């Protein structure tokens, strides 16, 4: 997992509440267990005018130009602004995979579904909870936003908005540590235990 560093980006304002994981990545695209390749089908039913299926050439599909992700001014955005209860519905980890593969590094919302919120951290995405007043400020601005995880701040128009984050999760993101890399920190201890265990119980 890549280290999470301070960055500046435009934000995509997706002003909808209760966006569920089936809207984020529809069920027909869940056959793969790879973490890459899902970005092209992020919000598939909203981005395209036809019905998408796995294996389709998305470059030939008709785009819904009214949908915010398809508008040219929001291309290459790394921040997503949404309303309350983002990521509700089924617990599919493909949802953060799709968001990450599209290029999002941070999602800002008044609230998140618990499982989705936890899955974001496991996949290197920073989910930020902000109150409605701050969300209104962010939605109303077209300026770029700076996310400083180390300082726990959102900066826009020379205004800083602090945010809360668990210190352990913050450390993991800053250092690019996922569950596998955390486990590998103890690889020597694991190998020593295995050697001792199988020497002692050599009939296993």
Swiss-Prot record:
InterPro entries: 3-IsopropMal_deHydase_ssu, Aconitase/3IPM_dehydase_swvl, AconitaseA/IPMdHydase_ssu_swvl, IPMI_Swivel, LeuD. SUPFAM superfamilies: LeuD/IlvD-like. Pfam families: Aconitase_C. It catalyses: (2R,3S)-3-isopropylmalate = (2S)-2-isopropylmalate. Pathway: Amino-acid biosynthesis; L-leucine biosynthesis; L-leucine from 3-methyl-2-oxobutanoate: step 2/4. It is an enzyme of class 4 (lyase). Catalyzes the isomerization between 2-isopropylmalate and 3-isopropylmalate, via the formation of 2-isopropylmaleate. Belongs to the LeuD family. LeuD type 1 subfamily. This is 3-isopropylmalate dehydratase small subunit. It comes from Vesicomyosocius okutanii subsp. Calyptogena okutanii (strain HA).
């Amino acid at each position: 997992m890549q280290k999470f560093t301070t960055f500046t980006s435009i934000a995509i304002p997706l002003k909808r509440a209760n966006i569920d994981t089936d809207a984020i990545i529809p069920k027909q695209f869940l056959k793969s267990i790879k973490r890459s390749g899902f970005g092209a089908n992020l919000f598939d039913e909203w981005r395209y005018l036809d019905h998408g299926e796995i294996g389709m050439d998305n470059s030939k599909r008709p785009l819904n130009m009214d949908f915010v992700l398809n508008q040219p001014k929001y291309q290459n955005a790394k921040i997503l602004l949404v309303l309350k209860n983002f990521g509700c519905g089924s617990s599919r980890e493909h949802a953060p995979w799709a968001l990450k593969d599209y290029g999002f590094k941070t999602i800002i919302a008044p609230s998140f579904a618990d499982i989705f919120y936890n899955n974001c951290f496991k996949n290197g995405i920073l989910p930020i909870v902000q109150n409605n007043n701050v969300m209104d400020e962010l939605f109303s601005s077209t300026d770029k936003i700076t996310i400083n995880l180390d300082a726990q701040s959102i900066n826009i128009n020379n205004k800083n908005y602090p945010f809360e984050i668990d210190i352990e999760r913050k450390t993991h993101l800053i250092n690019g540590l996922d569950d596998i890399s955390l486990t590998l920190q103890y690889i020597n201890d694991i190998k020593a235990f295995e050697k001792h265990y199988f020497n002692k119980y050599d009939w296993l």
